[in-house]
Amino acid sequence: QAQSERVLQFTESFRHLSYLPKPEKKLFSLTATLQNLRELLSGDFKESNIIFTLTCEPKTIYMKGDENQLSQVLLNLLKNSMQALEGKEKGRISIHAQQDEHISIDIADNGPGIPPELQEKIFIPFFTTKSEGSGIGLSLCKQIIRLHDGHLTIQESNPGKTIFHIDMPL
């Protein structure tokens, strides 16, 4: 039964990757979206002993994009950070969003880091180092950001610090 569940999960993941709808781009408050995600995960942060910080410059950032798709990307990156911090006594996750000529969003954690030999592979569909999950998450995130004419990269990853960087046009 476990194997059939994995096949179903794989099929569902493949369907998501291959049928990603075109983004419905509308003006929305990125700041409000980030605050909603903080609220959504606040119980998980508390339960996992994770300190979460959110900063936006300017205080309110508006952007054009598919709010649902971008929320999914941010939620996936936050959940990955939380998984990286499992068992850590003083976990920290921060999001720093900035608007100037473009929008940049950095999601940072103080987890173990991603080994250099895996940093290119983590965006490949179905690649995973976890016992659970399909390995589709980061690939899907990268594809969604690309559909918004943006880029998702690992800005830095060392033991004690990983930063995922999203760069998008206004």
Predicted regions and their residues:
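A conserved beta-strand-to-alpha-helix junction within the catalytic ATP-binding
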Residues: 1, 24-39, 96
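Short beta-strand/loop element within the Bergerat-fold HATPase_c
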Residues: 90-101
